[in-house]
């Protein structure tokens, strides 16, 4: 049995899409276990670019089984559009290769409206959400009023649950926000149509995954976002509403923790962040601009420019610890090409006191001054390099120094956006 979990080791946008695509080709089952269409990654295959938000990237391989787990919140409209877009590009999406958990919660228009109104009401203190209704959907799940895929498949159950929810939501829209609510019949009929279109894909994916694992299938779990956006372990409250850490795979897919063999942490060769929140190594100068433009650091889902900074070892050691990362995949090493000097944040200082562990307090994190170690850069184009030995000397020194500081070895190094622009240091 080989069960591998891929997690982002920073604030998301680490390049998990490419790494997942590479490993998906070598797996038999690919699973999403948390998040919704607030996440997104871009995969390039045979010169065609695919932007995926809900469906695992294994869908690009016709012989793989792709699973949307119970921990994912599903907007049926967004999912159906993604299916149609893939089919339009010649990708087969059918009940044999796409499975949706009957326990996954469903995103409704009122969730999206709640998201928008709540963010607007926070003014300058908004969290910078994608306004896709993800947080409000997870909140309904926690409040035990959420509607799941299995409910959507049963017209009578769905009718009763939607009716109760709309009465409650419409009252909130009117009394608190002075806004119009939603028409019951319109949502009911629209979502009944969605239900029939999605019905062939919906099943008990926990049983499916258990049986596949017992058969010895190679299973790959792909997390969305990153460790520092985790609801518990991220920079709260500037976090997502789910658990991108490796432990989230057990809850979000219904597999036991003892079934996980490997955890691969994906880390960019520098650091980026979308939206608000503290960022100790952020660069608000020409180097930050260089990284953003050369690395094309703009959100797949929102198009928002990402904040850029140097790599942060305190953060990476933290991610390794809370997810039990067994190896790392380094991405966008090529983006650093052309920089004369490259800095590595090896620790923080608060009022002269050295901080070695990532703080829980946002107030403390805001006060953290990065302690830097400077290394020589390189000017050679590395996109054609396929072995570690062929990298420029300073690039090799940089990678080796990161391994020493983090205490975990790299198994994959990405040197460009294309699938083949990859150095593989370990067989999977």
Swiss-Prot record:
GO terms for molecular function: adenylosuccinate synthase activity; GTP binding; magnesium ion binding. Substrate binds at residues 300-306. GO terms for cellular component: cytoplasm. Its EC number is 6.3.4.4. It is found in: Cytoplasm. It catalyses: IMP + L-aspartate + GTP = N(6)-(1,2-dicarboxyethyl)-AMP + GDP + phosphate + 2 H(+). The keyword Metal-binding applies. Mg(2+) binds at residues 13, 40. The keyword Nucleotide-binding applies. PANTHER family: ADENYLOSUCCINATE SYNTHETASE (PTHR11846:SF0). Belongs to the adenylosuccinate synthetase family. This is Adenylosuccinate synthetase.
């Amino acid at each position: 049995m080989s069960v591998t979990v891929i997690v982002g080791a920073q604030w998301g946008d680490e390049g998990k899409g490419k790494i997942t695509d590479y490993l998906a080709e070598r797996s038999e089952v690919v699973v999403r276990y948390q998040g919704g269409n607030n996440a997104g990654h871009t995969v390039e295959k045979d010169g065609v670019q695919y932007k995926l938000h809900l469906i695992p990237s294994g869908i690009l391989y016709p012989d793989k089984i792709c699973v949307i787990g119970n921990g994912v919140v599903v907007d049926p409209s967004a999912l159906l559009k993604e299916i149609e877009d893939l089919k339009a590009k010649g990708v087969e999406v059918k009940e044999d290769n796409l499975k949706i958990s009957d326990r996954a919660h469903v995103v409704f228009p009122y969730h999206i409206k709640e998201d928008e109104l709540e963010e607007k009401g926070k003014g300058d203190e908004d969290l910078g959400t994608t306004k896709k209704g993800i947080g409000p959907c997870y909140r309904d799940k926690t409040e035990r009023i959420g509607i799941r895929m299995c409910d959507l498949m049963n017209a009578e159950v769905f009718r009763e649950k939607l009716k109760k929810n709309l009465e409650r939501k419409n009252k909130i829209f009117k009394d608190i926000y002075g806004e119009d609510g939603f028409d019951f019949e319109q949502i009911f009929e629209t979502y009944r149509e969605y239900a029939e279109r999605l019905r062939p894909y919906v099943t008990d994916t926990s049983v499916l995954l258990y049986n596949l694992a017992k058969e010895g299938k190679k299973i790959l779990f792909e997390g969305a976002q990153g460790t520092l956006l985790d609801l518990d372990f991220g920079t709260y409250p500037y976090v997502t509403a789910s658990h991108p850490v490796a432990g989230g795979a057990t809850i979000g897919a219904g597999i036991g923790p003892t079934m996980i063999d490997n955890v691969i942490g994906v880390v960019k060769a520098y650091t980026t962040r979308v939206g608000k929140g503290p960022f100790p190594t952020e660069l608000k100068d020409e180097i930050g601009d260089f990284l953003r433009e050369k690395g094309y650091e703009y959100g797949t889902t929102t198009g928002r420019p990402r904040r850029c900074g140097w790599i942060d070892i305190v953060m990476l050691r933290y991610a390794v610890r809370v997810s039990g990362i067994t190896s790392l995949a380094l991405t966008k090493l090529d983006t650093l090409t052309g920089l004369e000097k490259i800095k590595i944040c090896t620790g923080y200082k608060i009022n002269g006191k050295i901080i070695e562990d990532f703080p829980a307090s946002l107030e403390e994190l805001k006060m953290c001054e990065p302690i830097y170690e400077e290394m020589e850069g390189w000017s050679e184009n590395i996109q054609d390099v396929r072995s570690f030995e062929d990298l420029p000397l300073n690039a090799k020194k940089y990678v080796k120094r990161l391994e020493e500081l983090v205490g975990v070895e790299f198994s994959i190094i990405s040197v460009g956006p294309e699938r083949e622009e990859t150095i593989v240091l370990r067989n999977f």
